[in-house]
Amino acid sequence: MSRLRRAGRSGWPVAGGDCHSLGGVTNDYIKTGSPIYARSFEIIREEANLGRFPEDVEPVVVRMIHAAADPAIADLIAFTPGVAAAALNALEAGAPILCDASMVATGIIRSRLPEHTRIICHIKDPRLPAIAEAKGCTKTAAAVDLWQEDGLLNGAVVAIGNAPTALFRVLEVIHEYFVD
């Protein structure tokens, strides 16, 4: 990568311009949060293939890339036209955000949501291990069934992070309950 430089005798790669080493450890780096945060998004916009995304979807894609730390995932992201407006409308109408993993729920910036938005993640629900075992599935897939049983799924915003079985189960439930 063009942004990497070698530091000191150890040759460890470090980000930034000219690196000064102190026994192989660089002291030339951004040291405060705000500039690091801003530069991260600049790098994403420089390196990711964002041109095919509509204006309302692009910020979501940029956040996904930031979370994954991989600009190449932009080429793997699919979207339905109108998805951003539909999600915003759902949230403004009081829909919850259903998350497969605590990491996803924690990463949601609550200050950017309508005030009473519920963020729901059942992964620590004590019922899940038994439900998953009885159904022969993962806990995250069983959590999707709990969302449906509790009447949460219809109209919700679903955020899937690192549990593909949750995504597959969401698609199955949508097909089973919501598609004619």
What do these predicted regions represent?
Residues G23-L98:
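Electropositive, gly/pro-rich neighborhoods at or near active sites that engage anionic ligands
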Residues P96-T106, I160-L167:
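Gly/Ser/Thr-rich loops at beta-strand to alpha-helix junctions
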Residues I108-H116, E172-F178:
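Short, solvent-exposed amphipathic alpha-helical segments in soluble enzyme
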Residues R112-A159:
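Long, charge-dense
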Residues T140, G151-L153, I160-F178:
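Glycine-rich phosphate-binding loops that contact phosphosugars or nucleotide phosphates
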